[in-house]
Amino acid sequence: MNTRTPADWKALFESDAFAQQNTYTGPLGVEYTPAGTRLRLWAPTARQVYVNLYRRGDGGVCIGSLPLEKRGQGLWSVYLPGDQHGRYYTYTLHAGGTSWEAADPYARAAGVNGRRSMIADFARIDPPGWLHDHRPNIPVSHRSVWEVNVRDFSQDPASGVRPAWRGKYLAFAQQGTTLHSDGIHPTCLNYLKRLGVSYVQLMPIFDFGSVDESRSLTRQYNWGYDPAHFNIPEGSYSTDPTRGEVRVRECKQMIAALHAAGIGVIMDVVYNHMYGNDNVLNRAVPYYYFRQNEDGSFSNGSGCGNEFASERPMARRYLIDSVLYWAREYHIDGFRFDLMGLYDVETMNLLRAELDQLPGGRNILMYGEPWQGGVSALHRYEANKNNLAMLNERIGIFCDNTRDAIKGGCFDAREPGYVEGKESALWDIGAAVAAWCRSSALPPHSPGQIVSYVSAHDNFTLWDKLLFVRYKRPEYGAMDSVALAQNRLAAGIYLTCMGLPFWQAGEEFARTKKGQGNSYRSSPALNRLDWQRAQQFHELVDYYRGLIGLRRYFPRLSALDTASPAAIQFFSLEQPLVGWQLPANCGDGALWQALCVFYNPTGQEKTVPLPEGNWKLLSDGISSSLWRGESQIRSGQTVLLPTSATIFGKA
């Protein structure tokens, strides 16, 4: 009988002797050929391991159980002769006088709810043409990120998506969708192509535990930040979660459709914790993959009951292997790390270096949340804001400094930001313009490390926040002219800041969740994109579209060098106005040789001086597409509209 306590396991797993004896560097998981399949499991604390074979992903009886052979460095292995494609399996592990069943932590396909792993020949299940899919070549100056949940994207009956595909991966692959199928107003992929975004960031798409795939989804909803399997797509987004090959094929169809539209796919990855403590990793090697307090209990820096021990060698390897797998097998264009502050800097830098070795890997984006969800037992360098200088310069962070300066704090719904009239925020607005490269508060290596944003899936939508600051009982569905102007100004600021612009899907059509600040398990109806609002607020959509297009013609706003922020010249204006210029060299491909921008958060017109020369008005705070035509030429001074961002270019 094993009498080790959790504290004993901690001491063992963190010992040099354990690492030396049990750090395995060979292949793990399934190695399939038509002639036979090799299964490999890393389980150094097990005394015996058996594989159990099934014909189905759920139900039915075990058709055979075979022992695995113990190899060195904690490895167990077995060879299954014959073509095993479509076979489901689990492991039974024996240790400490007891036994338990577990799925394969390295599995790449699974049955319903991931309870049984699946052996799959991907050459048979990949969608037609997958070998010809490739990451789109997106210039740095074109980068912008639109964040969405797979279900939210197409759940609205008005989306024009066929009913069987609503809320599914395949909704991204349906071409030509329009509002109520009217043939006029674009929705879904059709809409994205018109809007001009270059990347879609998908909220978690690997298998998560909070939605029961075997039941109707009508009343079930979750964002998916509760991973159950890290290398398998979520089954509830497929048209048939009971067949392991379907989720794999349809996830790839989604990615291929976005790539064909010239849109990159960024995957929101949640390696920082798992769904509950009775999970696939803890069943394989109890306690090893999760960080522990001094008494051996699980650390809870995620706020979800456990946190991933990225500093332990085989845990680090697991994380890196998984990310590389998604990059290679699914052609993912970028990775957004949830609670990145729970990973150690060394692991993140090693991962960046490994991604860079892939074909085209240096173009794969990598950024994350530089904070934690609670107190962590990680006592080495965390991948957070305080250690930004230690992170590779191509690992970016969400800049909550920029977010809070523009719209106000996210933890106090009524706290205003610059766009709502908080005059003292103007200094942070100036810092945000230069991507904080000229501020001691947050000195990144370069602007490329800063993700500039005002809304994401967490907290209030931008629209709800703007209304909540002004009204005790907002009418979220109303057309509010002040909030519209503030929304345009917010977009006008972060889309002219240096760095990577990012926003929550629907921000551009005043998305509302009726004041719900944390809708992770609210109703599908509350969370879904309301495509009728895209038509109702079409002028706001067009404003975003114009700014997205305009930004591309000022490549220096997306520059990755430190010289660009230093080139910005700020004007001395009456407070709380902010004005600045890039007086020359706006980057290769720029349509104008100089850029001049003003932000006016007041409700009054303001007259300001212009730099010397003739300036073309590109955006006046109401229309952001003036640059597309013959707009006004101004010199000497100009009038800023109330609550506006005004942009000029010098020919």
Q: What function would you assign to each model-found segment?
A:
Residues 1-34, 70-174:
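The feature marks proteins involved in alpha-glucan
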Residues 21-26, 496-516, 526-595:
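Glycan-recognition and catalytic regions of carbohydrate-active enzymes
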Residues 31-47, 567-611:
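Carbohydrate-binding surface patches
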Residues 41, 47-62, 605-622:
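Beta-strand-rich binding/interaction modules
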Residues 41, 91, 148, 202, ...:
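Conserved, mostly hydrophobic/aromatic
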Residues 43, 85-87, 630-651:
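C-terminal beta-strand-rich structural cap/linker in extracellular carbohydrate-active enzymes
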Residues 120, 352-353, 357-358, 362-509, ...:
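Conserved alpha/beta catalytic core and glycan-binding cleft of carbohydrate-active enzymes
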Residues 151-330, 339-359, 365, 376-377:
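Substrate-binding/active-site clefts of carbohydrate-active enzymes
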